[in-house]
């Protein structure tokens, strides 16, 4: 799915999902022909749910990255 489709499916703002992507929290695959980022639907929906729950619990983005096993770049 595209990031726009994830926005519609989750209700999370585009800018927030883009930030999660840039931070490495939301993995994607990039289509070579048009450079569109594609996200795996189920994996992405689950990851967004996890991130939202951790944010609601007061966790910072660096803490979430550590908890989810995302390496710092």
Residue ranges and their predicted role:
Residues 13-16:
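Short coil turns linking two alpha-helices in DNA-binding domains
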Residues 2-8, 22-34, 38-73:
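Arg/Lys-rich, alpha-helical DNA-contact motif
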